[in-house]
Amino acid sequence: MNLNEITAKVKELSSKSSGKIESKIKFVFNDGCIFIDNTVNPTIINNENQEADCTITISNDDFGKILNKEMDSMGAFMSGKMKISGEMTVAMKLSSLFD
């Protein structure tokens, strides 16, 4: 998946779980990033590199696998395919975004 495809899918999933995370999250990929500000309504989702409470670094391919339910996010983290910095509790809430 490329960044535009991932961004579109995250926007779709976020509309279903708006308000549950209540944090600022940044996903860093091979070809850019996605910033999600879920502290405001409506949720802001863009490709700007902004400060976040939690930053998750993962490849486009591995994130695509998580979105398509081909890979578990916990498994990706435990195997080192996904790195998390910042507030770990925010990262733990992200499962609500992918359910």
Model segments located where?
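Feature captures hydrophobic
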Residues: 1-99
